[in-house]
Amino acid sequence: MELKIQNITKRYRDKTAVDDVSITLTPGVWGLLGANGAGKTTLMRMLAGILRPSSGRILCDGVEIGTLGAAYREKLGYLPQEFGFYPEFTVQDYLEYMAALKGLPRTEAARQIDTLLERVSLTEVRRKKIIKLSGGMKRRVGIAQALLNDPEILILDEPTAGLDPGERVRFRNLLSEFAQERIVLISTHIVSDVEYIAAENAVMKAGKIIAQDTTEGLVKQIEAKVWQGNIPMEQLSRWEYRLRVVNLRNEPDGTVTLRYLADAPQLPDSVPAQPRLEDLYLWLFPEEMEEAK
């Protein structure tokens, strides 16, 4: 199984949402990282066959997805950022409806729904109306519908939005298990969602893929740019605005330990810190750190 994206561009009048993107996806979990507005959702909608590219091609095992048509859709599971449902639908109603749209026989659909509801911990609310569920529960319903047809290609746009930490861990484990011999693409700006389960990550910015590698390979790009230093509490506000602080920790002696990004050490007695994928993300998207100040 191979999904090849060749020089894909998507334009809306005077705006280019996706700009000449090329990447080849093979079985395993792939992370698609980027800030809001980077072009991730537009790219995923093209991969799902919802949008047509302005130029470029998407090939599934060497054949354009437009040519494959229904045969491609049968291989596909897709969870958009926002998914619609009829207000009167219960969880069971919705999954049965989606299974019918995907062409699953009733007996197979019933078996698959039972299995997936258990996997996403929704068995007890299967008769409850979706409109009355919490945001996290609705997201889990969406995840279940994306898995109904046991897809070979799974495209998930911000799948963990609204999930609590325990649900996110269970979801990551489910995806790792599911990704055997399947392509799973996860779009997110929550780096921890993909840091430990993605075989490779691609980073999008302003419609372009600006970096692509394994987690280890990407993290190497930020080596010697992550530092840790200790300051008195009364100096915190001054340094917080001068540095790109990733996080801080209050110490028992009244000082503060800062983890920060810089080309060279800025604080007295700073030492190099072990880089993480989140550090690379914040290095590439400094505007997100500025917004938090």
Regions found by a protein language model. Name each.
Residues 48:
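Helix-to-loop junction immediately C-terminal to a conserved catalytic motif
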Residues 56-67, 71-72:
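Conserved ABC transporter NBD signature motif
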Residues 35-39:
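Walker A (P-loop) phosphate-binding loop of ABC-type ATPase nucleotide-binding domains
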Residues 170-258:
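ABC transporter nucleotide-binding domain
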Residues 96, 100, 107-125:
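Conserved ABC ATPase "signature" region
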Residues 154-158:
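Catalytic Walker B motif of ABC-type/P-loop ATPase nucleotide-binding domains
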